[in-house]
Curated annotation (Swiss-Prot):
Keyword entries, A-Z: Bacterial flagellum, Bacterial flagellum biogenesis, Bacterial flagellum protein export, Cell inner membrane, Cell membrane, Membrane, Protein transport, Signal, Transmembrane, Transmembrane helix, Transport
One GO term (biological process): protein secretion
Chain segments annotated as transmembrane: 45-65, 88-108, 185-205, 209-229
Protein name per Swiss-Prot or TrEMBL: Flagellar biosynthetic protein FliP
Subcellular location: Cell inner membrane; Bacterial flagellum basal body
UniProt family annotation: Belongs to the FliP/MopC/SpaP family.
Stretch forming the signal peptide: 1-21
Domain of life: Bacteria
Length: 245
């Protein structure tokens, strides 16, 4: 009973004018250009909320999708479904994504974050300026056919230029282009390992060893070939160059 009385008194105090005056206000201030500048509390809330969209941004708006798909196809081509493990591939993909996206991140930092942290521009202007380098990166990797497809599905009419492409069309078109590019790279990776599989299977058939799994015999030859050509360096270097070629 005492606890209930205490909670009731505490609730009444919180809703009193004196307590409300001590709480920080969530206000916005008008700017000279006609916009609004939100208080630090609102900006912090928006920033923390935006962090929940970070995985989606990583998958949909960076080079991560192409890299992780190529790594998965490489593992299938080698015939090692559990080596390297998923954690290692994810770590490599994240680091390679960071290196590839570093010019875009630097431009966002210089053009958007620094002026916003110095209170030279509003949050809306910072968001607009920060989105421009990311849009330019995505447009460079997106095929015109994919843009036309999603523009037709959205009934938006013919696109007038790169600046007129809305994000709701650019995002799925970019992901579709990344999937196609990743599968093209994966096809190129599969060819030498497929030749090894065919040769090993033919040799085993000629020797009458039909009960021996060809994948077991072919695996060391695949690993030896991949190591001899310095496959990891070749693959990661080619992936990085594919975004700026």
């Amino acid at each position: 009973m005492r606890r209930l009385l205490f909670l009731s008194l505490a609730g009444l105090w919180l809703f009193s004018p004196a307590a409300a005056a001590q709480l920080p206000g969530l206000i916005s201030q008008p700017l000279a250009g006609g916009g609004q500048s939100w208080s630090l509390s609102v900006q912090t809330l928006v920033f923390i909320t935006s962090l929940t969209f970070l995985p989606a941004i990583l998958l949909m708006m960076t080079s991560f999708t192409r890299i992780i798909i190529v790594f998965g196809l490489l593992r299938n081509a080698l015939g090692t479904p559990s080596a390297p493990p998923n954690q290692v591939l994810l770590g490599l993909a994240l680091f390679l994504t960071f290196f590839i996206m570093s010019p875009v991140i630097d431009k966002i930092y210089v053009d958007a974050y620094q002026p916003f942290s110095e209170q030279k521009i509003s949050m809306q202007e910072a968001l607009d300026k920060g989105a421009q380098p990311l849009r330019a990166f995505m447009l460079r990797q997106t095929r015109e056919a994919d843009l036309a497809l999603f523009a037709r599905l959205a009934n938006s009419g013919p696109l007038q230029g790169p600046e007129a492409v809305p994000m709701r069309i650019l995002l799925p078109a970019y992901v579709t282009s990344e999937l196609k590019t990743a599968f093209q790279i994966g096809f190129t990776i599969f060819i030498p390992f497929l030749i090894i599989d065919l040769v090993i299977a033919s040799v085993l058939m000629a020797l009458g060893m039909m009960m021996v799994p060809p994948a077991t015999i072919a695996l060391p030859f695949k690993l030896m070939l991949f190591v001899l050509v310095d496959g990891w360096q070749l693959l990661m270097g080619s992936l990085a160059q594919s975004f700026y070629s």
